[in-house]
């Protein structure tokens, strides 16, 4: 119950956050549907506050717009997974699920980035073959870390002309 209630709260935040960019979202209807969903899950139960929020704390660590899309894409996917195990015959659940699917589709780039991060986490850096590949790519990775704006500033500076 605790997870589900905080999930519902974060769902509200996601819907509102993307409601400003996705004009097709009817936030008033979604809020009403989410209230019905909270009632379905009995989110006023006393154990809801135990352990703190599930997603809200994670959202605080992702500050940039692109970063938020990455974490929100994962959270939206988790909500959709949660709704797979609920009664889809209820209109409010069906409506929320449909809106989440629309949001997930608009965040598909974030889903790919999450997959990339998970793939990186799975790499066995003790494997000699992986180490060889990593050594081969190290210079390119370091080039990506170099501050590109410093190079741009040099190009944009007016060239000094010789007054000979």
From Swiss-Prot:
One example of a Gene Ontology biological process annotation: humoral immune response
Signal peptide as annotated in the record: 1-19
Location of this chain's protein in the cell: Secreted
Gene Ontology molecular-function annotations: cytokine activity; type II interferon receptor binding
Glycosylation sites: 42, 61
Keywords: Antiviral defense, Cytokine, Glycoprotein, Growth regulation, Secreted, Signal
GO CC annotations on file: extracellular space
Gene3D superfamilies tied to this protein: 1.20.1250.10
Coiled-coil features, chain-numbered ranges: none
Family: Belongs to the type II (or gamma) interferon family.
Function: Produced by lymphocytes activated by specific antigens or mitogens. IFN-gamma, in addition to having antiviral activity, has important immunoregulatory functions. It is a potent activator of macrophages, it has antiproliferative effects on transformed cells and it can potentiate the antiviral and antitumor effects of the type I interferons.
Summary of subunit composition and partner proteins: Homodimer.
PANTHER family from the UniProt entry: INTERFERON GAMMA (PTHR11419:SF0)
Protein name: Interferon gamma
Organism encoding this protein: Numida meleagris
